[in-house]
Design a protein with these regions (language model features):
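Short, active-site-adjacent cap segments at secondary-structure transitions
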Residues: 68-70, 98
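ATP/NTP phosphate-donor binding region
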Residues: 1-62, 70, 74
């Protein structure tokens, strides 16, 4: 099957965009067929992922930080009426990469590409708050306020 990479080019303050060629080389070296689509702004990863999942792409690869991963998971959730999400691959380009660290996954793109290509999966628990599915954490107070402020910031190159 062909994988769909949902790339947030802004992740890690444009780190994802800069490392895109490295990611593509890693996916090719792992023998993967893939298509890449870039998100254009906050929330777009949800709709792009939902469409990709409904079109039969598998796995879906979230290329970005924790926010991008969250959007991809929500897109997979919307595409799955039975609540069972399809396989998800991760390409860590974020500032913190909390989920990747908490799962003990490698930050090396080559290692991640080989892991995705192997097809090995594991289940993780998800939570829901106000119809938003979360994979790693949910917060109140300062953290979401900082996130909202960050979303409104101009994305300078």
């Amino acid at each position: 099957m062909t994988a769909k990479v949902i790339l947030n080019p802004y992740s890690g303050r444009w780190l994802a965009q800069k490392r895109r060629p490295e990611m593509e080389a890693a996916l090719r070296a792992a023998g993967m067929e893939y298509e890449i689509i870039e998100t254009g702004g906050p929330g777009e990863g949800v709709t792009l992922t939902e469409a990709a999942a409904r079109q039969g792409f598998s796995p879906i690869i979230a290329a970005g930080g924790d926010g991008a991963i969250g959007e991809v998971i929500n897109g997979l959730h919307r595409a799955s009426p039975d609540g069972v999400l399809g396989p998800l691959g991760l390409m860590p380009f974020g500032t913190a990469n909390d989920l990747v660290h908490n799962l003990g996954l490698p930050l090396d793109l080559g290692e991640m590409a080989r892991a995705i290509a192997s097809g090995k999966t594991r289940r993780i628990d998800l939570g829901t708050a106000n119809e938003w599915v979360f994979d790693n954490n949910s917060a109140v107070g300062l953290e979401p306020m900082v996130t909202l402020y960050n979303i409104r910031m101009v994305r300078l190159r």
